[in-house]
Amino acid sequence: MAGLKLQAVTKSWDGKTQVIQPLTLDVADGEFIVMVGPSGCGKSTLLRMVAGLERVTSGDIWIDRKRVTEMEPKDRGIAMVFQNYALYPHMSVEENMAWGLKIRGMSKAHIEERVREAARILELDGLLKRRPRELSGGQRQRVAMGRAIVREPAVFLFDEPLSNLDAKLRVQMRLELQHLHRRLRTTSLYVTHDQVEAMTLAQRVMVMNKGVAEQIGTPVEVYEKPASRFVASFIGSPAMNLLDGVISASGDRFELPGGLALPIGADYRGHAGRNMTLGIRPEHIALSSQAEGGVPLTVDTLEILGADNLAHGRWGDQKLVVRLAHQQRPAAGSTLWLHLPEHQRHLFDGETGQRV
């Protein structure tokens, strides 16, 4: 197995604006890292730099303790799996999986051994003579993974490999990818815009925004302790409720427009008068009552999801979403009294967006 290291890596197209700002990342041997973020955040550019398909403006890339910054892609010990499968339509499954080894001059017996083993792992044994047009989307993606596996790379690079699949098949392929990584334990760098993929597949998640790694941590860490307002808004479905306000002069209240306020147990006197954003996830809001000092939410709409429901409404001028149990279906226009537990709240600096 091999590790991957990015050391102060940057990318600029025009020599002025950095689309990837200085980024350092250590990926341990056998670790599965997922880069997630919105379109244009730089995640695919970074993956292509690791692959050698884009030049690094500054910084270094190391694979298996070897500096590969200027190496050709074929010499880096990587294998890529793409969104569009990139299979040769005129070749069989077996030929597609073997082609990369064949052009490298590997012996026929060795190629056959690797292809058979990869086919067994991916349950493609009975499909080796078929052409890509005879396969389902999930089967084609497994062939693309098989072609990467036979190379026995130091690092797997996945570029949104599940994006072309329907919702049901994506769930199935996520499970297959988890199983595959447990078997192979190959260092993997995976790019997606889908936070569900990121949270379910990753050992660590790197949340990217405008060329910056906003947070690198386990799925639990980025969910429970988002490092910034951006991470808080991006990770979680539905998104975290974010309320803009100000810390009171006494440091013990969070004041919102329209005369609304929430007590804050911790002493924030050092931040008195500063603009802040208070966040709380819809699933962390509890039902309460007026007598218990609950926050009144006027329900606008209700989304019935099956296992649970989402109530969208207003507290004064503030929009809030709360996750409710399946049997709780408040009508539009009704009032819910809510409790926002202090230990589930998050505060972010109003200017920098960083966690306080």
Swiss-Prot record:
It is found in: Cell inner membrane. GO terms for molecular function: ABC-type glycerol-3-phosphate transporter activity; ATP binding; ATP hydrolysis activity. ATP binds at G37, P38, S39, G40, C41, G42, K43, S44. It is an enzyme of class 7 (translocase). It is a peripheral membrane protein. CDD domains: ABC_MalK_N (cd03301). PROSITE patterns: ABC_TRANSPORTER_1, ABC_TRANSPORTER_2, UGPC. Its main location: membrane. It comes from the Bacteria. GO terms for biological process: carbohydrate transport; glycerol-3-phosphate transmembrane transport; glycerophosphodiester transmembrane transport. It catalyses: sn-glycerol 3-phosphate(out) + ATP + H2O = sn-glycerol 3-phosphate(in) + ADP + phosphate + H(+). Pfam families: ABC_tran, OB_MalK. Keywords: ATP-binding, Cell inner membrane, Cell membrane, Membrane, Nucleotide-binding, Sugar transport, Translocase, Transport. Part of the ABC transporter complex UgpBAEC involved in sn-glycerol-3-phosphate (G3P) import. Responsible for energy coupling to the transport system. The complex is composed of two ATP-binding proteins (UgpC), two transmembrane proteins (UgpA and UgpE) and a solute-binding protein (UgpB). This is sn-glycerol-3-phosphate import ATP-binding protein UgpC. It comes from Salmonella typhimurium (strain LT2 / SGSC1412 / ATCC 700720).
